[in-house]
Design a protein with these regions (language model features):
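Structural detector of well-ordered beta-strand residues that form the stable sheet scaffold
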Residues: 3, 54, 79, 133, ...
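Conserved N-terminal subdomain of the carbohydrate kinase-like
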Residues: 48-129
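Conserved beta-alpha-beta core of the PfkB/ribokinase-like small-molecule kinase fold
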Residues: 131-178
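Cofactor-binding loop segments of dinucleotide-utilizing enzymes, especially the Rossmann-like FAD-
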Residues: 5-9, 58-61, 83, 137, ...
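Glycine-rich phosphate/adenosyl-contacting loop at the front of the ribokinase-like
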Residues: 1-56, 65
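Short glycine-rich anion-binding loops that position phosphate/pyrophosphate groups of nucleotides
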Residues: 8-10, 98, 106-108, 137-140
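A general structural detector for well-ordered alpha-helical segments in enzyme core domains, enriched
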Residues: 42, 118-121, 146, 150
């Protein structure tokens, strides 16, 4: 099994316009919603390639069911630690010149109790995993050192992969990744 840990899921809202005119009314040509997060994308990719994925991480009460529906459609089993609030939304505006403008949400804060629950979940699930992938950003209020705590909680037999940058990556490297 390949376990993926998503700490900050997001709804990507891609809006195509003839041109993006700041301060004016713009007409949408097309709009696409994607229920993502780097680790969830990994799990979906593993499923599409015929592998054995399992997704876990943090999810939010108000709109998390849309992520469950998307993972069900892709054949990805999952267990999430549920939090109050909404999944963050990232907006991508594409104009007819193929210029991309992004506006990314920071999302909801997560309590220390919930991050502790996730540590326990990762410890349990990683014992059944050949590979464990932690990928993406952290929710507001969760320090970069949490990446290291996750890797230290993992079963020593699982192959540990971090897809991160900056302080999160250094925290994972200090904890030991493969």
């Amino acid at each position: 099994m390949i376990l993926t840990v998503c700490l900050s899921p997001c709804t990507d809202i891609t809006i195509e316009l003839d041109s993006l005119n700041v301060g004016r009314t713009n007409i949408v040509k097309s709009k696409t919603l994607s229920f993502t997060g780097k680790a969830l994308n990994v799990a979906i990719g593993v499923a599409r390639l015929g592998g054995d994925p399992y997704a876990t991480g943090l999810m939010y009460n108000e709109n998390g069911y849309m992520f469950e529906n998307a993972l069900d459609k892709e054949g990805v089993p999952f267990t999430f630690i549920w939090n109050k609030g909404r999944v963050r939304e990232n907006y991508k505006f594409i104009d007819n010149k193929s210029m991309l403008t992004e506006v990314n949400d920071v999302g909801e804060e997560v309590s220390e109790a919930k991050t502790g629950e996730l540590l326990n979940m990762v410890q349990m699930l990683s014992a059944r995993s050949n590979v464990t992938v932690v990928s993406g950003s952290l929710p507001r209020g969760v320090p970069a050192e949490y990446y290291g705590r996750l890797f230290r909680a993992m079963d020593p037999k699982t192959i540990k992969i971090a897809d991160a940058e900056g302080a999160r990556l250094f925290s994972a490297l200090d904890a030991g990744v493969d």
